């Protein structure tokens, strides 16, 4: 009976599919097309991570494809253009709108400008021809500016073999100039180049926090043709806040105050901070040095004091909000983080992990020593208002929804494992387990459980104290979290304890065991990937090149690409981080130098700011059939062949 039902369902599916193809020839054409696509070289994947709100640096890397645009320009024009001309042309391709204005102002006559237009349009056509050489015409057409598809295709596929259409092509370009369409065409062609040199973008976590413009990064990603995201610990903090976690909300507000980025909250997302400021002004001192923002440049003394007060107010609220979760979730094993209960308020000291420390920079004005974890009525009202404002922000809703749609905790893709943080292990390299809802979870299963609960929390934003919402916060700070990757987060100690030994956050053994090739192979196998061919691509931890640390570990099985976009870490890493390119020939790690500014590029030309290093070279050039996309296409082919056999062969 079941077999008959399955057959009936399959027949109905084939009936529906057959409606797309009116004839046998149409069906055959589609199969031929798909089979041919499988033989094309795989597209270039671009991996970035830890963007941390640094929109302009991210934009630059995106526009130049981690040096891929410059590489294509060099390939074509290195023998015909000077270094300066290549720099100028590269800058035009990266920032066409702004560079065009500068170039146009440099010409003294219209005829000179028109000559430049002709030369530049022809160069861009030549560059697109080269950059699109591994794509079908259909795919290229989708990348072209819609208003100029016909004109560009005529120029791309022109042939003067019989010398019949020379004046036709000449007239095309001359008319573009005469009708003042040159600027729009050049801008469109430049963006086409940017999209062609990278087929797919992977963001390996941490779009948010520290930097000033994560919202602009999100808008860019929403408009990007092909992208996926592996959530970072800072990303789940924002997801958690929107999903109803007040403790996640308190954490992200504290971080914004710490890095003087409260403008993100108020101006970018329209969230009203006035209730929090009123509370802070009422209870806290603006001189507390531990709560001064890390970057006070450009702030007035009044602004500095206001941020310092807000910083204290939200930090104390955060510590209070953590306690109820720790108490109702014993499987989180976080009792030592009941920090407000560890304080002897008379002696002004705290006992943590069996050791007693004197406290400094204290701001315990709203804490009742007899019930230190209880929010005051005023604090409770402030958090209610803030959460309501967060969940009513349309822009934040759009950004968080996109994060959920495009994001996962980890991603197996084209034989590689993409993961922001870690896979929790013990010192012997065995997967660490955690009990979630009476189920013992470890390895891939643990990460799957985490992700399921994140999605559940997001789907039930009105519930604030369920296991799902608590687990989103745990991903930010818990010892078995794949995103945090440390035994404890010592935020309290960093504010109030002078002894720096108390600040130490012990990393999960994963971070030194990932140097071991056998360990990495074991992890790849656990995630269903080929341990001989695959790689683990990791973000989260800045690579300290300045100290000789190598981002390529475990004989090339582990590649760490913390982007180093965060200016706060560039002094400790020595560079502006790494990105990764993976094309049909293999993988290249790109080390980036500090990005000055867009203005510097526009005025001085786009000089090379990156150094490439081969990670892995394919013995055989990779085709689309070897990729995830190829698997999807093959499944379509199999179904279409079944339809052909069912409808036309029998």
From Swiss-Prot:
Pathway: Carbohydrate biosynthesis; gluconeogenesis. Gene3D superfamilies: 3.60.21.10. The keyword Transit peptide does not apply. Its cofactor is Mn(2+). Its EC number is 3.1.3.11. InterPro entries: FBPtase_class3, Metallo-depent_PP-like. Keywords: Carbohydrate metabolism, Hydrolase, Manganese. Pfam families: FBPase_2 (PF06874). It catalyses: beta-D-fructose 1,6-bisphosphate + H2O = beta-D-fructose 6-phosphate + phosphate. It is an enzyme of class 3 (hydrolase). GO terms for molecular function: fructose 1,6-bisphosphate 1-phosphatase activity. One of its GO terms (biological process) is gluconeogenesis. Belongs to the FBPase class 3 family. This is Fructose-1,6-bisphosphatase class 3. It comes from Staphylococcus saprophyticus subsp. saprophyticus (strain ATCC 15305 / DSM 20229 / NCIMB 8711 / NCTC 7292 / S-41).
């Amino acid at each position: 009976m079941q077999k008959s039902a399955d057959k009936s369902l399959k027949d109905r599916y084939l009936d529906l599919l057959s409606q797309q193809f009116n004839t046998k020839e149409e069906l055959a054409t589609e199969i031929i097309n798909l089979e041919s696509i499988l033989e094309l070289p795989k597209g270039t994947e671009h991996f970035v991570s830890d963007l941390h709100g640094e929109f302009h640096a991210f934009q630059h890397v995106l526009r130049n494809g981690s040096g891929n645009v410059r590489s294509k320009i060099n390939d074509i024009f290195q023998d015909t253009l000077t270094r300066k001309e290549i720099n100028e042309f590269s800058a035009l391709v990266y920032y066409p709108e702004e560079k065009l204005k500068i170039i146009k102002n440099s010409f003294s006559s219209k005829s000179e400008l028109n000559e430049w237009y002709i030369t530049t349009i022809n160069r861009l056509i030549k560059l697109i021809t080269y950059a699109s050489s591994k794509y079908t015409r259909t795919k290229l057409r989708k990348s072209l500016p819609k208003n100029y598809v016909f004109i560009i295709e005529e120029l791309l596929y022109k042939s003067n073999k019989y010398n019949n259409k020379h004046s036709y092509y000449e007239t095309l370009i001359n008319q573009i100039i005469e009708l003042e369409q040159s600027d729009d065409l050049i801008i469109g062609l430049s963006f086409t180049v940017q999209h062609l040199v990278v087929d797919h973008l992977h963001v390996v976590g941490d779009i948010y926090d520290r930097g000033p413009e994560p919202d602009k990064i999100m808008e860019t990603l929403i408009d990007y043709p092909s992208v996926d995201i592996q959530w970072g610990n800072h990303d789940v903090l924002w997801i958690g806040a929107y999903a109803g976690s007040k403790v996640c909300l308190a954490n992200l507000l504290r971080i914004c105050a710490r890095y003087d980025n409260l403008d993100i909250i108020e101006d970018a997302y329209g969230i009203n901070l006035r209730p929090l400021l009123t509370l802070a002004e009422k209870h806290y001192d603006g001189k507390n040095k531990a709560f001064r923002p890390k970057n006070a440049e450009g702030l007035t003394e009044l602004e500095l004091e206001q941020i310092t007060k807000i910083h204290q107010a939200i930090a104390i609220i955060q510590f209070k909000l953590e306690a109820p979760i720790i108490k109702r979730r014993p499987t989180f094993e976080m009792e030592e983080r009941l920090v407000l209960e560890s304080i002897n308020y008379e002696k002004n000291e705290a006992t943590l992990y069996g050791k007693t420390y004197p406290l400094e920079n204290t701001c315990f004005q709203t804490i009742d020593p007899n019930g230190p974890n209880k929010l005051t009525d005023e604090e409770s009202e402030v958090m209610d208002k803030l959460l309501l404002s967060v969940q009513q922000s349309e822009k934040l809703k759009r950004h968080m929804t996109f994060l959920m749609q495009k994001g996962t905790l980890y991603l197996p893709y084209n034989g590689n494992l993409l993961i922001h943080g870690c896979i929790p292990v013990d010192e012997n390299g065995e997967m660490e387990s955690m009990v979630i809802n009476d189920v013992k979870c470890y390895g891939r299963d643990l990460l799957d459980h985490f992700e399921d609960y994140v999605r559940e929390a997001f789907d039930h934003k009105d519930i604030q104290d369920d296991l799902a919402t608590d687990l989103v916060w745990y991903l930010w700070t818990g010892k078995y979290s794949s995103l945090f990757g440390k035994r404890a987060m010592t935020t309290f100690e960093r504010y109030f304890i002078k002894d720096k030994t108390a600040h130490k956050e012990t990393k999960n053994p994963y971070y030194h065991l990932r140097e071991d090739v056998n360990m990495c192979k074991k992890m790849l196998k656990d995630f269903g990937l080929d341990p001989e061919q695959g790689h683990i691509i990791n973000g989260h931890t800045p690579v300290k090149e300045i100290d000789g640390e190598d981002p390529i570990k475990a004989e090339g099985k582990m590649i760490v690409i913390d982007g180093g976009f965060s200016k706060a870490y560039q002094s400790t890493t020595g560079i502006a981080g790494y990105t990764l390119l993976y094309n049909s020939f293999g993988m290249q790690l790109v080390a980036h130098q500090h990005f000055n500014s867009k203005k510097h590029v526009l005025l001085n030309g786009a000089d090379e700011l990156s150094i490439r290093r081969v990670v892995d070279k394919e013995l055989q050039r990779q085709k689309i059939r070897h990729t995830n996309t190829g698997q999807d296409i093959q499944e379509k082919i199999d179904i279409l062949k079944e339809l052909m056999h069912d409808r036309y062969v029998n």
